[in-house]
């Protein structure tokens, strides 16, 4: 019988950038023994692998995902699996089970969840998990206890015999939890289920240096050699961390937002998007971070709105997580009542990017008395966005913007 797993997220910087603040970034900053820090390497490696697979499957489409959301949802699901299914799932997420126990993995996600929940008052943060269970199914008490303990997941009874009503109820639940920003999660999906797992993330933060609202102008965006679209192009003239990479064909800037996060905007040279994406790794990010210099930059970035639903089943199978979708799936730690297998792993993402920031002293950008000509950097062709929480080193979001319209 089918089991559906959904992850959904929202990054909506209508007041800057939607993000998370963990805790004091100076506290035990180098203490990599913290449970959540033990996840960092595996989570980032999984993030780039998943991103590259999705990009390859949709070479001309916008891509926007929250890797940490997907990792957390799949890790939670692993609590209900046994045997080869469990080992394959955790190894597919990048964990070496000879080096890290399953308990340590789940403790790491538990601490990560708790840190994300400790957002600053200037941020809005909602992150959660929910399990929707058909009334005919008896959930094993151990599974219910584990997902509540590690992932603070709610368990809600549903009547999946009436699929239309059940899907509306789940849509309503997610809509309420994400303050009306994630809607119609089940739109266009007609597969009945007896158990649905949902992971959702909603968060809002602010640019430390907002874009100048009055400077936004309509400009050309060159999608490809034959397609040009008009976009509202934002402008920020300030001191920004900038790098013209000598090894990869790209330029990039790193910008901070209120909290513990950082965002990279990467502009590949014309026709070199795939070259840059292929090189994305932890080593590349470390090299970029070390090479950035504070520069006077006139930065032009288009206002972006992207919405998409991704069925991750084929991608996960390519990445070695295959048992979930076959009759070999072993979900015997969820219930003894039925033979379950995953029919879908769906991830819904929404991205909006605009100018606004916190209206406080020192947060409206930097006015410069230029002694040299500023670098002019126009994101008027396909580009990459990466957002990290630099306390937990979580890969919050990865995007490829092919067409911002």
Swiss-Prot record:
GO terms for cellular component: extracellular exosome; extracellular region; extracellular space. Cortisol binds at residues 254, 286, 390, 393. Pfam families: Serpin. One of its GO terms (molecular function) is serine-type endopeptidase inhibitor activity. The record marks 250 as: Conserved cysteine within steroid binding domain. The keyword Secreted applies. The keyword Iron-sulfur does not apply. It is linked to Corticosteroid-binding globulin deficiency: Extremely rare hereditary disorder characterized by reduced corticosteroid-binding capacity with normal or low plasma corticosteroid-binding globulin concentration, and normal or low basal cortisol levels associated with hypo/hypertension and muscle fatigue. Belongs to the serpin family. Major transport protein for glucocorticoids and progestins in the blood of almost all vertebrate species. This is Corticosteroid-binding globulin. It comes from Homo sapiens (Human).
């Amino acid at each position: 019988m089918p089991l559906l797993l959904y992850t959904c997220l929202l990054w909506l910087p209508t007041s800057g950038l939607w993000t998370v603040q963990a805790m004091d970034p100076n506290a035990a900053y180098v203490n990599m023994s913290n449970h959540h820090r033990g996840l960092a390497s595996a989570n980032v490696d999984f993030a780039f692998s998943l991103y590259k697979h999705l990009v390859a499957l949709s070479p001309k489409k916008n891509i926007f995902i929250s890797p940490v959301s997907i990792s957390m949802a799949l890790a939670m699901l692993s609590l209900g699996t046994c045997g080869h299914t469990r080992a394959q799932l955790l190894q597919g997420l990048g964990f070496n089970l000879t080096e890290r126990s399953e308990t340590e993995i789940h403790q790491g996600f538990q601490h990560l969840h708790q840190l994300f929940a400790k957002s600053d008052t200037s941020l809005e943060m909602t992150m959660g998990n929910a399990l929707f269970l058909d009334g005919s199914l008896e959930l094993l008490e151990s599974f219910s206890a584990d997902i509540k303990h590690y992932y603070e997941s709610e368990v809600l009874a549903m009547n999946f015999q009436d699929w239309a009503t059940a899907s509306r109820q789940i849509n309503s639940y997610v809509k309420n939890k994400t303050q009306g920003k994630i809607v119609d999660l089940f739109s266009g999906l007609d597969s009945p289920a007896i158990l649905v797992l949902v992971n959702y993330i909603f968060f809002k933060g602010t640019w430390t240096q907002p874009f100048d609202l009055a400077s936004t102008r309509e400009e050309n965006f060159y999608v490809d050699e034959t397609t040009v679209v008009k976009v509202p192009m934002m402008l920020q003239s300030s001191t920004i961390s900038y790098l013209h990479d000598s090894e990869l064909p790209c330029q990039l800037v790193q910008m901070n937002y209120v909290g513990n996060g950082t965002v990279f905007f990467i502009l590949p040279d014309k026709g070199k998007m795939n070259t840059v994406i292929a090189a994305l790794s932890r080593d590349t990010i470390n090299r970029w971070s070390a090479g950035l210099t504070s520069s006077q930059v006139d930065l032009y970035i288009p206002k972006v709105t992207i919405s998409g639903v991704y069925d991750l089943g084929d991608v996960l199978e390519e990445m070695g997580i295959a048992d979930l979708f076959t009759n070999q799936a072993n979900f015997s730690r969820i219930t003894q009542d039925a033979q379950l297998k995953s029919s879908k792993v769906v991830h819904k993402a929404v991205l909006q990017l605009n100018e606004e920031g916190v209206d406080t002293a020192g947060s409206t950008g930097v006015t410069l008395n230029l002694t040299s000509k500023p670098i002019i950097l126009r994101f008027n062709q396909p580009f990459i966005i990466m957002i990290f929480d630099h306390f937990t080193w979580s890969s919050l979001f990865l995007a490829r913007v092919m067409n911002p319209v």
